[in-house]
Curated annotation (Swiss-Prot):
Domain B5, chain residue ranges per copy: 399-502
Alphabetical keyword list: Aminoacyl-tRNA synthetase, ATP-binding, Cytoplasm, Ligase, Magnesium, Metal-binding, Nucleotide-binding, Protein biosynthesis, RNA-binding, tRNA-binding
Protein name per UniProt: Phenylalanine--tRNA ligase beta subunit
Main location as per UniProt: cytoplasm
GO cellular component terms, A-Z: phenylalanine-tRNA ligase complex
One Pfam family hit: FDX-ACB
Family named by the database record: Belongs to the phenylalanyl-tRNA synthetase beta subunit family. Type 1 subfamily.
EC category: ligase
tRNA-binding domain: residues covered: 39-150
Record domain FDX-ACB: where: 728-821
Domain of life where this protein originates: Bacteria
Catalytic activity: tRNA(Phe) + L-phenylalanine + ATP = L-phenylalanyl-tRNA(Phe) + AMP + diphosphate + H(+)
E.C. designation(s): 6.1.1.20
């Protein structure tokens, strides 16, 4: 938000310097981002007069001028090529050494076609403050000679830019900024009253509102206007805040948008069809805005229509077909109250960024709907003339009045400062709050209409498990507490947060509390485990597209976001696998699937009807290696199962206690997936190939395997003091076996039997291959199993290795009936 010092003086009577104003703005929470004075770029430019002008002897298009430019430049010769240079003309003169911003040059004395030239006569475009280019600028005949041009043109007017937080829609107006400064001790706020203009005739146009996001709208016709350029003062004001002047009618609406924070719109009556304008829902149609862009509207969008069609996208941008121009004679002025959420949703979806949207989506002052129309009427009548109709309206102004209560002791107990009750009340009154009730301990205030962020009544939903009456009382208490905190914040920001003393937290115990919770510690452990297994960690939004969420099951309405940060992030995610799949798709499309980017994991929240849960999720796709130095191959579900098992074992779950059932969720391949359980009821995770339909919808091709660990459901291990592991100095020995197993044999049973063959030597057992077909009997599978043997005191001999191999073979045969493939 930008504003000039002269514009601020329209609302605030002050003597403070720019530096003092900026310091106070920062203290009261309106952070200053920059200060720019246009006069700083115009040092060296003077007002001057051409005393004499004659044609250059060697160039027909040049003139040699004698210029009077004040002290030190009483009689200067300047060679000028402007066609309008003539004797007696008052001009802008650039002295030698002056930087010309519009040309990016510095003026020097020199000769032009043999004639001395001691400066330059300039156009406004060359100064960087205008568009005209038909020669040099022509000043008034009353312009003094030798004065700084910036001072003469009233351009010595610093412009301050501040950052506005989303809750402070009232600070998107110069009056709102002035109000805060006055409350903060800078000057006195001037009263603002607008004239109520009586209508001369009934309005030929009427309003009708059918959209719930427009509770109240007013307007009036002004006929017989003359829409020409705005006066210089108005153009300078708009240019100072970065708004390009267009015409008087448009400039009035832009001026009041910045001055009062009151967006308005004007329609050319001659371009409208019918006698009624209706605020309604859009159909699936297109609309061309004043910016020339074509927008595709949705059924939730709010539009203003006449008999011919859409004339405005309400609260965002007017239509090209009904815009005013230099031929406009009759104009219809609109002032309305629109729902902030609806404006934000449509604006974000259509990527419309206007001053109107910026204010409506933060909430405007509902009490100024009529006053804004009256202010526009007065300005248009003064600048453009015309006759004014009576006001037409539709809907009703909502009851915006609400109260907030502040206990004075809370300034000490919560705010950390000791402020007298009278000073507290006085601070809030300066901000526009009115005391409705006061006792020795507390005061109740009527919240001003322009502060939509205080005691708004919007409270987060309570837990669904609460009794309805309990939830209602809880919400009421939360609302009252938030309103009190709002008032406390207002008092503290005027007091100055820098003045709040720093106080150490009380030490309640000698033994410090753990820095992390057990759940956080387990999440950190899983990150290390997954990284060690070659997966790369990602961090994704907890929001996903609704269509993506639907691929992973039902999409409850309770998980749909009413005000998403982006149109494709409108649903709480049911699983982090969605984010991983999208990231993996982008990585593989860039050829990053061979260096770890084809294997991703995330530890993050997921959401369902019962609430929020913490999950570990991982995906593998593309080529992956079983271990370093081994040829890469396409990811299989066994790697996903191994990842899942490694995570659970790291969390203290005995591998022998795990079992697999073939009832994984529907987003997995129905025949290549499973759930991992501890006992018959406790589901700890899932693994398998993603369903091909789901993978394709998420932009993936080929085999994609995934796994999830439900951290909330993994039991904490029993506290046992374990002996320190004995590390062997000897190399482990790996032996591969191929067992032929029948269709009813569980792979887990084979692995368990191999592991139990020799507890002293068998350190690990892993499945690395499954083969079907060939010479195998129908329905049978060949299971490739790697057994890792770890000797402790001496290296194993061939005889010992052969004995262990026979023990493994015998144990598997006895437990499962699987035989060694010959």
């Amino acid at each position: 938000m930008k504003f000039s010092l002269s514009w601020l003086r329209e609302h605030l009577d002050f003597t403070a310097s720019v530096e003092e104003i900026c310091a106070r703005l920062n203290i009261i929470g309106l952070e200053v981002e920059g200060v720019e004075n246009p006069a700083d770029r115009l040092v060296g430019f003077r007002t001057a007069k051409i005393v004499e002008a004659h044609r250059h002897p060697d160039a027909d298009r040049l003139q040699v001028c004698r210029v009077a430019a004040g002290a030190g430049f009483e009689d200067v010769q300047v060679v000028c090529g402007a066609p309008n240079a003539r004797a007696g003309l008052h001009v802008i003169f650039a002295t030698p050494g002056t930087y010309v911003p519009g040309l990016d040059i510095t003026i020097k004395k020199g000769k032009i076609r043999g004639q001395d030239s001691g400066g330059m006569l300039c156009s406004l475009r060359e100064l960087g403050i205008g568009e005209e280019s038909n020669g040099i600028a022509e000043l008034s005949e009353t312009a003094p000679i030798g004065e700084s041009y910036a001072a003469y043109a009233e351009l010595d007017d610093p412009v301050i830019e501040i950052a506005i937080t989303p809750n402070r829609g009232d600070a998107l107006s110069i009056r709102g900024i002035a109000r805060d400064l006055a409350a903060g001790g800078i000057g006195h706020l001037k009263p603002w009253l607008t004239e109520a203009v009586e209508g001369d005739f009934p309005s030929p146009l009427t309003w009708k509102t059918e959209h719930p996001a427009c509770p109240y709208i007013v307007g009036r016709v002004i006929r017989g206007v003359k829409n020409g350029p705005s006066p210089d003062w108005l153009q300078r004001r708009l240019e100072s805040v970065g708004v390009k002047p267009i015409s008087a009618l448009v400039d009035v609406t832009n001026y009041l948008t910045y001055d009062l924070g009151r967006p308005l719109h004007v329609f050319d009556v001659a371009k409208l069809k019918g006698d009624t304008l209706t605020v309604t829902h859009a159909a699936r149609e297109t609309f061309t805005g004043l910016d020339g862009r074509e927008y595709v509207l949705g059924t939730e969008d709010m539009i203003i229509v006449d008999e011919a069609g859409v004339q405005s996208l309400a609260g965002l941008i007017g239509g090209e077909s009904s815009g005013v121009d230099e031929n406009t004679i009759d104009v219809f002025v609109e002032s309305a109250l629109f729902d902030p959420v609806r404006i934000a949703l449509t604006g974000r979806r259509l990527a419309i960024h206007t001053d109107a949207r910026q204010r409506f989506e933060r909430g405007i002052d509902p009490a100024q709907v009529l006053n804004g129309l009256e202010a526009a009427t007065v300005m248009i009548r003064d600048l453009c003339g015309g006759e004014v109709s009576e006001i037409t309206e539709a809907g009703a102004l909502p009851d915006w009045k609400r109260t907030a209560r502040l206990r004075f002791e809370r300034l000490k107990t919560l705010g950390g400062v000791d402020i007298a009750a009278d000073d507290t009340v006085r601070s809030l009154e300066h901000l526009g709050f009115e005391v409705t009730e006061r006792t020795e301990d507390a005061a109740t205030f009527l919240v001003p209409s322009w502060r939509n962020d205080i005691a708004s009544g919007q409270v987060l939903a309570q837990a669904p498990t609460l009794d309805e009456d309990v939830a209602s009382r809880a919400a009421s208490h939360v609302q009252a507490m938030e309103a009190e905190c709002d008032l406390l914040e207002e008092v503290l920001r005027l007091y100055g947060l820098d003045n709040v003393p720093a106080v150490a937290l009380p030490q309640t115990t000698v033994v410090p509390a753990p820095a992390v919770t057990p759940l956080q510690a387990r999440a950190a452990l899983l990150r290390r485990v997954c990284a060690a297994r070659g997966l790369t960690e990602t961090v994704g939004f907890s929001f996903v597209a609704q269509d993506d969420a639907a691929l992973f099951g039902d999409v409850p309405e309770t998980q749909h976001l009413l005000n998403p940060i982006a149109t494709d992030l409108d649903q709480l995610r049911p699983t982090p696998l969605i984010n991983l799949a999208r990231a993996l798709s982008r990585n593989l499309a860039r050829g990053l699937g061979l260096s770890g980017e084809g294997a991703l994991f995330e530890v993050g929240p997921s959401f369902d009807a019962t609430g929020q849960h913490l999950r570990l999720a991982g995906l593998r796709a593309g080529l992956t290696a079983r271990e370093p130095g081994v040829a890469a191959h396409e990811a299989t579900l066994w790697e996903a199962k191994a990842d899942l098992t490694a995570a659970l074992v790291a969390l203290g779950v005995p591998e022998a206690a795990l079992s697999v059932t073939a009832d994984a969720p529907g987003f997995y391949h129905p025949g290549r997936s499973g759930q991992v359980r501890q006992g018959p009821k406790m589901v700890l995770g899932t693994f398998g190939e993603l369903h091909p339909r789901v993978a394709r919808a998420l932009g993936l091709s080929g085999t994609v395997v995934a796994f999830e660990v439900y951290l909330d459901q993994v039991p904490l291990p029993k506290a046992k003091r374990k002996a320190a592991p004995v590390l062997s100095p000897l190399q482990p020995v790996r032996r591969d076996f191929a067992f032929v197993a029948g269709p009813d044999v569980e792979i887990q049973a084979v692995l368990k039997a191999a592991r139990m063959a020799d507890r002293n030597l068998v350190q690990d057992v892993r499945l690395f291959d499954v083969f079907e077909g060939g010479s195998l009997p129908e329905g049978h599978r060949s299971l490739g199993v790697e057994v890792v043997l770890q000797p402790q005191s001496e290296s194993l001999t061939d005889t010992q290795l052969e004995a262990v191999s026979k023990s493994v073979e015998a144990a598997v045969l006895k437990a499962t009936g699987a035989v060694l493939r010959r």
